[in-house]
């Protein structure tokens, strides 16, 4: 909804056509119908609509924030701008600077308020959005980094992996329980595996990349001894 009400969109280090097709479709819709300008820091490739690349470096974000380029004037003249940042941009060494300085910049110019939020992060996994909603993950909480440091240093004695997990875990003396339907990295190193159905084999509520809760009805029944997640 915010995308459809925006009068300017700035993409930073993301390719919504590949990372979030529905978001990209919404952007294309407003670009075609309302002719709103779309800009990008970084070259995302073919997005199926017109956009202008205003730079490819962190310096270009600095120039925007400090009103040191022509685009800064264009951005500040808009009433409802939207910035969409990709996770890949936040994974850079300058990622924390990018996020914090943009927040300060947008708050200063009242682009973040109860009525409008100009700052958006395009997560690469829908589960990231759900974990943020549950306050299990935050882009600003230092405890997140402490957790990953402890994981890398094998400081945990017990790990419970729920669902498909793409974490790089070097098993040492941890006791690992894996609950899920796919034989991913977590299942390979688990001491105990609790088989559960795939999402197509059980009813459930899921949060998508836009933060919308969607209901899923099972299309088939699980095989073998697999039990639904809530029963486990």
For the regions a protein language model found, what residue spans apply to each?
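Non-catalytic alpha/beta scaffold blocks inside enzyme catalytic domains
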Residues: 1-232
